[in-house]
Each structure stands twice: as C-alpha cells, then as structure tokens.
Regions:
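C-terminal motif of bacterial Sec signal peptides marking the signal peptidase cleavage site
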Residues: 5-8
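Start-of-domain marker
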Residues: 13-110
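Secretory pathway targeting signatures of secreted, lumenal, and periplasmic proteins
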Residues: 14-17, 32-37, 41, 175-238
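Signature of long, low-cysteine stretches enriched in small and polar/charged residues
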Residues: 70-123, 228-289, 303-304
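Long, acidic/polar, low-complexity amphipathic helices and coiled-coil-like
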Residues: 102-165
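Surface-exposed amphipathic alpha-helical segments
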Residues: 125-149, 172, 178, 289-323
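Extracytoplasmic beta-rich ectodomain segments of secreted or membrane-anchored proteins
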Residues: 159-175, 179-183
C-alpha cells in the first residue's frame, strides 16, 4: 500500500456528515488563511518561522509541514477542501486575548480546521511564536490517526498470524507490502524489501522488572541486543544497532487506551554503511509481566524519508490487545 499522493480523508469521492466530500491534499500539507487587511510579508515570514520546523530525528533535515498561504479574500473552494487549515482571525471587537481552537469537517469530511484568534497583529505574532510547535504536533497526530485507519480493513494477515504465534496477546495491522518475514524467540521481523524506500517492522518482548524497564537506557540496550541476534546485514559479521552518536527523543503517548513510551532515533548497520530513522513504542504488558516493543525502521539512502516514516509510524497506532 503506497502512500497516496492525493489523499481523501474520508474516501475519494465519498461524502461524510451532511453531504460533505472528503478532504483532499497530501499528508502533512496545510493552508494558512491570513486575515483581510493584515496579509503582509512580515506575517507570512512569521508563519514560516513558526511552522517551519524539521521532522524530528531524520538523517537529513526535511520540513515537517508543507505550508501554503492565502489571503482571506482568496480562500477559494480549492483551499477549503484541504485536509489541514490554519485560519487566522484578528478582531479587537470580538477578542480580548489570543487563543487556539479547533473544529472539524467544516468544509470537507475528515478535515482539521485550527483557529488562531487574537485582538491584534502583535498578539498573533506572539501566539504563533508560542504555539507553532503545538499546531504542528496537532497536525502530525491527526495524520497518524487518518493513515492508521487505512489499515482497518486491509492489512497483512500473515503478520497478524505471526504476531499471535511469536508474541501472543496482541494484534497489529500493518501494510500488506510487509510480506518478507523472519521469526525468532519472541521476535518478529517483516519487511517490504522496497527498492525506492524500504520499511521494516519488528516486534519483541523482554521481562518487566519495574518502571526502569521502560526507561530509555533499558529500551535501547535490549533493542541493540535483540537486533544484533536477529537482524544480520549483507556482509559477514554485520548487524543492525542504534546510532548512539545521535540522541534519541522520548515521548509518552497513548493510543487505543494503551500508554506507550515512544522512542525516535537513528539506526546503523555495524560493519556496513546502511542506516536510517526508526520509531518504536514500548508498552508495559501487565498481563504477561513483560515489555512489548513494536518498531518501524525506514531505509532510503539519499531519498526523502518523511512520508515513509509517517506511514510506517501510523501502523504502530493499530496495536491493540487481542480479544
């Protein structure tokens, strides 16, 4: 299942709620609507600075968001159909302080509309400076949810079966392209063997011995040990490991009612020249007194990795306890 170039958030040509057609546009693409009378080069520069951060932990810088801008008067149906919209409003009669709000499906089904409201241009500048990262994170999380639903009905039954056999107690829905599989002791590996951008999935477990079992050092130490044993490279003696020269980024997230420790970092092949980004979720599997780790890695030397990582990461959000 390739990442679509033009994605309809509720199905192409379908409608959702009150006859709305599905929102369109590329993942992580957004339009910013600038208020009438305030559309200036300075405001546009402020928007670019606030929303121009790179995606976290990639080997090269890639902008997290693709940002388009339009004036309020030119906010046509083409823009109204897009999946992510930031609508800036300045009105001293209606607002006394800056605020951020969201609404959904206003112009199209599956659409996220973020409102930035303030009483003055100066307040908008401050709001963008303070909340730019929060706005970007909101859009990124929305894209993960959207893409994860692409696997509600169509997913790899082979990986689901191996997850049950090798891990037990959990199910995950991953891309049907992940058809090359390998198993070990409480370990599962699936790959699409892609030529222009490759994605691999890992799942493994280790004993839960207290809160320290979910700390970064422990997760990475186990990861390195498991991958050294199970993921050999093309050259004799080579194996996958963590690139320790680049710090990992840790966050605590929740999906399907399950708290998760999220770790982002770079991987490298010891004894070879391969490398790329990874993201994993580590979970306290209380019923089985163990930690479950599910992970996606991407390999695309010299190529853009943002969309590959987004699609790969979205599949981790399909993990849930087996019935």
């Amino acid at each position: 299942m390739a990442l679509p170039l033009l994605f309809s958030c509720s199905g192409k040509g379908s409608s959702k709620g009150g006859g709305l057609f599905g929102a369109t546009g590329k993942p992580l693409e957004m339009v910013v609507v600038l208020p009438e009378g305030y559309d200036s080069e300075a405001l546009r520069d402020s928007v670019k600075q606030a929303l121009g951060m790179p995606m976290m932990v990639l080997p090269q810088n890639e902008p997290l968001l693709t940002v388009m801008m339009t004036g309020e008067r030119d906010f046509s149906q083409m823009f109204k159909s897009l999946r992510n919209i930031l609508y800036i409003t300045i009105d001293k009669e209606r607002y006394t302080s800056p605020s951020i709000g969201i609404s959904r499906d206003q112009f199209a089904g599956g659409q996220l509309l973020i409102h930035a409201r303030a009483e003055s241009l100066e307040s908008i500048y401050r709001l963008l400076d303070l909340k730019g990262r929060s706005i970007a994170d909101m859009i990124y999380k929305e894209e993960l949810v959207r893409l994860s639903h692409a696997f509600d009905q169509t997913y790899s039954s082979e990986v689901a079966k191996l997850m049950k056999e090798q891990i037990g107690g959990w199910t995950i829905r991953v891309n049907t392209d992940l058809e090359y599989t390998h198993t070990g002791d409480h370990f599962l590996w699936a790959s699409d063997q892609g030529v222009k951008g490759r994605t691999d999935f890992f799942a493994f477990t280790y004993p839960y011995e207290g809160p320290q079992s979910l700390e970064l050092d422990r997760i990475i130490a186990v990861r390195d040990s498991v991958l050294q044993q199970n993921v050999a490279g093309a050259h004799e003696g080579s194996y996958m490991s963590t690139e320790h020269r680049v710090p990992q980024v840790v966050r605590h997230v929740e999906a399907n009612g399950i708290p998760r420790t999220e770790v982002r970092g770079l991987w490298a092949m010891v004894g070879d020249m391969m490398g790329g980004p990874f993201v994993l979720h580590a979970i306290n599997d209380e019923a089985n007194k163990r930690v479950l780790v599910v992970e996606m890695v991407v390999y695309y030397p010299g190529g853009p990795k943002k969309n590959l990582m987004l699609l790969a990461e979205s599949q981790l959000y399909t993990l849930e306890a087996a019935e």
